[in-house]
Design a protein with these regions (language model features):
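Interfacial loop-to-transmembrane junctions
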Residues: 287-310
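Juxtamembrane C-cap of transmembrane helices in multi-pass membrane transport proteins
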Residues: 189, 284-289
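Membrane-embedded alpha-helical segments of transport systems
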Residues: 208-211, 238-239, 304-314
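Hydrophobic transmembrane alpha-helices of multi-pass small-molecule transporters
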Residues: 244-245, 313, 322
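Alpha-helical transmembrane segments and their lipid-water interface positions
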Residues: 212-216, 281-285, 309-312
């Protein structure tokens, strides 16, 4: 069998001497000239690590560094527990420091939007409210809040009328959201068994977060509020309620001598308020176009991001503990 004859590759028509070669297809297309000042659109390279996801480091299902989050949570829990066991007023110092930091974070976050709440009066009002709640009870807490609101309104007058209502309302929101609600934790600390009350409150809120996270990761399919918090599911909510009710029965019954059915109600209520607090802060962050209130705590964001479920739950916990386990 003879080999196939050799044939040259087709390189197009052979040019004729004295006649210009026909233009190629690429050369026949008109050249696009960018207008002055224009830039080429960036090309996105897929499959390469980004700055948000370092090489060799994968975030958890929650989108955060789970190891760092657990470590920070344990450290915070140890500080709170130690302050309650060693000397009860030491917890007031921890609470006051947390209120100051969370207030700064919230004011800075609001200023990234169109709000300009005055920082000085709300920052000074936090320790005042905590101290009056400890020394004067509910009346002192309310009085401290009213004094702070008046200070916010007067302080903002110095900047003129433009945006006054907007900024003063934002300042009142900060005073209500952080120091006023945190003051209920100070009220829980007042009775002789105040340390046990605070522990029961915090542990139940933690059970809400842990139960909701575990159930949401394992079984979450039906989104609760996709436009606010896409990762929250009704299955996770069921896990929060179940974990809180179990914790409520054990803590109210064993630590505070309350009825078991009171523990069920306490746990269910804390699960609801903790979820509302989480969703409420997520709504504020989405409105402001930010992911976290700060970056103080690795794996968590800011301190305000950890207090979002604690703050509204503190008021409900104080009221229900006063009802089911009166001092």
């Amino acid at each position: 069998m003879s080999p196939a004859p050799w044939r040259p590759h087709d390189t197009g028509p052979i040019p004729v001497v004295g006649r210009p070669a026909p233009p190629s297809a690429a050369a026949s297309r008109p050249t696009e000239v960018l207008p002055a000042g224009a830039t080429l659109a960036p090309v996105e390279l897929t499959g390469l690590p980004t700055t948000e996801q370092p090489v060799g480091k994968k975030p958890g299902r929650s989108g955060r560094d789970l190891g760092a989050a657990i470590g920070v949570a344990l450290a915070l829990g140890a500080v709170i527990l130690l302050s309650l066991l060693v000397w009860r007023p030491a917890f007031l110092l921890v609470l006051t420091a947390a209120v100051v930091v969370a207030t700064i974070e919230l004011v800075r976050a609001l200023r990234k939007g169109r709000f300009r709440p005055p920082l000085v009066p709300v920052l000074a009002g936090g320790p005042v409210m905590i101290g009056l709640a400890w020394s004067r009870g509910p009346t002192g807490l309310v009085a401290g809040f009213l004094i702070t609101v008046l200070a916010v309104m007067l302080w903002r007058l110095a900047e003129g009328p433009v945006g006054y209502l907007r900024d003063a309302a934002a300042g009142v929101l900060v005073a209500l959201y952080v120091p006023l609600l945190a003051g209920f934790a100070a009220l829980m600390l007042v009775p002789d068994d105040g340390a046990a009350r605070v522990v029961a409150f915090i542990v139940t809120v933690v059970c809400s977060d842990v139960g909701g996270f575990a159930a949401g990761v394992l079984f979450g399919k039906h989104r609760m509020a996709p436009s606010i918090s896409p990762k929250k599911s009704w299955e996770g909510m069921a896990g929060s309620v179940s974990a809180c009710m179990l914790a409520g029965v054990l803590l109210i019954g064993l630590m505070l001598g309350g009825p078991w059915w009171g523990g069920l109600i306490f746990g269910a209520a804390i699960a609801v308020t903790a979820t509302i607090g989480d969703l409420g802060e997520s709504l504020i962050k989405r409105d402001l176009g930010i992911k976290d209130m700060g970056d103080l705590l690795p794996g968590h964001g800011g301190l305000m991001d950890r207090m979002d479920s604690l703050l509204p739950s503190a008021a409900v916990a104080y009221l229900l503990l006063s009802l089911f386990a009166p001092a």
